[in-house]
Design a protein with these regions (language model features):
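Beta-sandwich/jellyroll recognition modules and their flexible linkers
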Residues: 1-266, 349, 356
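Generic detection of short hydrophobic beta-strand segments and adjacent strand-loop junctions
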Residues: 17, 105, 166-168, 286-288, ...
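Surface-exposed loop/edge segments in extracytoplasmic proteins
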Residues: 26, 145-155, 277-290, 414-415
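Short, aromatic- and glycine-rich surface loops/edge beta-strands on solvent-exposed regions
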Residues: 182-184, 304-344
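Topogenic and prosegment regions of secretory-pathway hydrolases and membrane enzymes
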Residues: 219-225, 231, 264-270, 304, ...
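Beta-strand-rich binding/interaction modules
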Residues: 248-285, 403-409
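Intrinsically disordered, low-complexity Pro/Gly/Ser/Thr-rich segments with frequent PxxP/GP/PP motifs
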Residues: 274-317
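Beta-sheet-rich sandwich/jelly-roll-like modules and their strand-loop junctions
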Residues: 328-414
């Protein structure tokens, strides 16, 4: 297959040719261009992948932006494009932003008598930005023979709520064609990660009914990002020099029973995998997972905390400069429909840095006002030198790429 590497450059910059003194640049040279290209992308025809469901990647598939999701992963809509840049930074205008469009679907073999329904869950805001009342999440259907997208459903922006179910019957003959599509769009701010809506459990099916609104599933709601106490990542040599007492005493596990009836609980497990082989395991006690209830109650999310400070740990005898381990977690009940949601996979990285976060950005934080400062404290496992810092700057609302800031390192002063 064709291999390509997309490269995005932001903000735009000029490249000066200095190969020979006095020569004109040997690339296209425009003084004061009215337009500029701020990214370089190579396009290839996609392979016909039968597992592919959606055509675009503008909506952001993530595991952290939703509050109390029903399962692992949501599609989030905001004012950032597929590369994480604002559609129009600096503007106060609102317009259509992200699209999530299905592949063409062959609906020629079904009719209204087959009781076709589309269902999904949505949530405004989540851990992100509250969408205003003038913002909206929109569902449209494509009528192939008419070459026309039609409005089907929408909801206005609002403060944070739990996930709301939507259940829509498809009974218009215009949609029972080969080439039917559906798409979700958001209308909101274009200048950054703003006006969030989150989408989950999109399900188009036959032989349904108006009362068929139950999502019979048992699922993790968030991945487990770290088994370490305090940090999500530490330098490997710091860990292996003193591994005792570094495993977490409070690993958070979130699971949900979305069925409308109680379900029997079972023990779960977390395994440490290295190079495809299991090197350690921990039991997720059913009594902790369900907070002591006799069964998993209907439509209930449970958060529990598990002590892994004793027992297995990451094998400190590994000799690599950097190391990484797979964390495989599993928990279920007896009647789960979507077994992919019964497990969650993540990696424990040991490289050359300390980190507290999971690598995702739900909101932007920063100092405001003149001469303001922001500090974050790290207490390393052992004395060492600081040679750099990695910071994620979220392009949002105002272009600050020309603003100056000073990166300062403070030594510990008994604080």
């Amino acid at each position: 297959p064709v291999v390509h590497v997309p490269t995005d450059v932001y903000p735009p910059y000029y490249i000066y040719d200095t190969l020979e003194v006095g020569n004109l640049p040997d690339t296209v040279w425009i003084v004061g261009p009215e337009i500029f290209q701020d990214s370089a992308t190579q396009f290839f025809a996609p392979v016909n992948d039968p597992e592919l469901i959606w055509l675009e990647s503008q909506a952001y598939h993530n595991y952290s932006l939703a509050v109390n999701p029903w399962s692992l992963g949501v599609a989030s809509f905001d004012g950032l494009d597929e590369n994480g840049f604002p559609y129009n930074i600096g503007t106060t205008l609102t317009n259509y932003a992200d699209n999530l469009t299905s592949k063409p679907i062959d609906m020629s073999g079904v009719s209204a008598s087959d009781s076709v329904y589309l269902s999904f869950l949505y949530q405004p805001q989540g851990f992100g930005d509250e969408p205003e009342g003038s913002d909206s999440l929109i569902l449209e259907f494509y009528a192939k023979d008419l070459d026309q997208w039609n409005w089907i459903w929408s909801t206005q922006g609002s403060p944070l709520t739990g996930f709301e179910p939507v259940h829509i019957r498809v009974d218009n003959s215009d949609y029972f064609k080969k080439g039917f599509q559906l798409r979700f769009r958001n209308y909101g701010g274009l200048s950054g990660s703003l006006d969030h809506f989150h989408l989950d459990y999109v399900n188009l099916r036959t032989l349904s009914g108006y009362q068929d609104t139950v999502v019979r599933d048992f699922a993790f709601v968030y991945p487990i990002h770290t088994l370490l106490e305090t940090f999500t990542s530490v330098p490997w040599d710091h860990y292996k020099n003193a591994p005792i007492g570094k495993m977490s005493s409070s690993v958070e596990v979130g699971v949900r029973n979305s069925d409308n009836s109680p379900e029997n609980e079972q023990d779960g497990a977390i395994e440490i995998i290295y190079g495809g082989s299991q090197e350690g395991s921990f039991i997720l006690s059913e009594a902790l997972l369900n907070n002591g209830d006799l069964n998993y109650l209907p439509w209930t999310t449970y958060y529990s905390y598990h002590d892994f400070s004793a027992g297995d740990r990451f094998d400190e005898t590994k000799t690599g400069l950097y190391e990484e381990f797979d964390i495989v977690s599993a928990a279920t009940h007896q009647n789960s429909n979507f077994t992919l949601n019964d497990s969650t996979y993540s990696k424990q990285y040991f490289q050359n840095y300390y980190s507290y976060d999971d690598g995702s950005a739900e909101q932007s934080y920063g100092p405001t006002g003149n001469q303001s400062m922001l500090a974050i404290k790290y207490t390393p496992y052992e004395a060492d030198s600081v040679i750099g810092a990695m910071i994620h700057f979220v392009p949002s609302v105002i272009d600050v790429t020309e603003n100056l800031f000073l990166l300062t390192m403070w030594d510990d002063n008994g604080g």
